[in-house]
């Protein structure tokens, strides 16, 4: 029987995106995907409300394509979104 699973378009590279009082109520991931025309795979997300302010973080897996990964990190920098590479 033929394998019918979709091809894996994601690399092993993952980043942690931090959501603070400036970004928690914005559609950061959808804006990123639309602006960069590159998919991300959400691995984990957690948000909490502290003193009426939402904070959180999300781990996303990046595409295999190096140009797309560079576009994503450039967009995050340009939009002052805090992120770090996950090991």
Regions found by a protein language model. Name each.
Residues 1:
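P-loop NTP-binding/switch modules centered on Walker-like glycine-rich loops
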Residues 4-87:
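Non-catalytic connector elements of ABC transporters
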């Amino acid at each position: 029987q033929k394998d019918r699973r979709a091809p894996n378009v994601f690399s092993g590279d993952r980043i942690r995106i931090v959501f603070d009082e400036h970004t928690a109520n914005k559609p950061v991931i959808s804006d990123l995907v639309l602006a960069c025309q590159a998919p991300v795979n959400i691995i984990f997300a957690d948000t909490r409300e502290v003193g009426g302010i939402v904070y959180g973080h999300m781990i996303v897996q990046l595409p295999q394509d190096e140009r797309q990964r560079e576009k994503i990190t450039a967009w995050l920098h340009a939009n002052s979104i805090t992120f770090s590479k996950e090991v």
